[in-house]
Amino acid sequence: MKFPASVLASVFLFVAETTAALSLSSTYRSGGDRMWQALTLLFSLLPCALVQLTLLFVHRDLSRDRPLVLLLHLLQLGPLFRCFEVFCIYFQSGNNEEPYVSITKKRQMPKNGLSEEIEKEVGQAEGKLITHRSAFSRASVIQAFLGSAPQLTLQLYISVMQQDVTVGRSLLMTISLLSIVYGALRCNILAIKIKYDEYEVKVKPLAYVCIFLWRSFEIATRVVVLVLFTSVLKTWVVVIILINFFSFFLYPWILFWCSGSPFPENIEKALSRVGTTIVLCFLTLLYTGINMFCWSAVQLKIDSPDLISKSHNWYQLLVYYMIRFIENAILLLLWYLFKTDIYMYVCAPLLVLQLLIGYCTAILFMLVFYQFFHPCKKLFSSSVSEGFQRWLRCFCWACRQQKPCEPIGKEDLQSSRDRDETPSSSKTSPEPGQFLNAEDLCSA
């Protein structure tokens, strides 16, 4: 039985960020900054409440008679109680022999084109730990993108405008960044386990390191770009946020309406149609919050029973990063054109170059992960390197086809004039290189 390290990490980030936010809000209050205090408390307490509801929903405690658990969640102590319960189950699992076990069947990763199916016994204690890990993974994602991401953006904006970074603010920003990166990492692992549910997935430590670096560069550069743009064009940032929000929020619903599928009723038996709609809207809101800052890795599909698309769409991944890179470049260009005196001692071209290189570095680590460290890379129909080679061949073929077109047209015109001037009996033999078709160029 695995040690519940993910549960411990989730609880640590939850407690550390909440404590740092409450301490910083008291500092803002003593300094007379009421607006910063209110926003700091909002981005701290709102995800706390959502985390409590998530844990209650996953464990189905709302329909069970557990008043103490409900009271602890109302006091915002639910994650601490759940963590204590997890470690009690873990340390007591080896002492008691379980009378009932369930059998799960998983397929191993293919070796030499063959994949074996293995059976594994899962006891009640291990099943409870799996449920707890799943609940805390979802809670970490909610805390990261509905609380930590806005909190990090807010505190960095305050630091830029005040031109001062205090110890409490830097501590909160560091914890918030770690929380966002951890939440994005859980999104990647969750996407892999959902898409390859039939297989036994084992993620290596180097894969975790690669995902951590990928997400760190991606999220850090995105937050800095948004803060820089907000500091000079406060009105237009609302337009950017609304465009991003409605684009990602409406996209799954548009696909659902176009598919003509019936409204999903099998999310939770105890939920009514109104409750199901609220849950779907909340999931869409979370999906939107993730994509505002980074690639979600999990594609929401409302017409699917699992609500998650199990197909890996490389096209969506490519389009997302192309559009996001162009958007970041445009926002940085606008910041460079309209920057104020607070950036007097900042080398603006160097900062723009560093941010663009940082985002490209994130894309590089993403490609390295999918090429070398993805646990299910053997199941891919094509790898990243093969796709890049095909794209390079097509690009070279297009360039070679375009270059001979101009001289061919001129030489054909000259040869036709020569035919008109010379007698019909005399014929000129064309050079073989002048009339190569597209297939010969491609084979060459």
UniProtKB/Swiss-Prot annotation:
Biased composition, class Basic and acidic residues, residue ranges: 408-422
Compartments where found: Endoplasmic reticulum membrane
UniProt-recorded Gene Ontology molecular function terms: protein-macromolecule adaptor activity
GO CC terms: endoplasmic reticulum membrane; membrane; plasma membrane
Effect ascribed to mutating residue 327 to K: In MCLDS; atypical without hematologic, neuromuscular, or cerebral involvement
Residue numbers spanned by region Disordered: 408-444
Record protein name field: Endoplasmic reticulum membrane adapter protein XK
Organismal lineage: Eukaryota, Metazoa, Chordata, Craniata, Vertebrata
Mod. after translation: Not glycosylated.
Record bears the keyword Transmembrane: yes
Stated family: Belongs to the XK family.
InterPro entries in the cross-refs: XK-rel (IPR018629), XK-related_adapter (IPR051773)
Membrane topology (Cytoplasmic): 1-2, 59-68, 162-171, 230-235, 299-317, 371-444
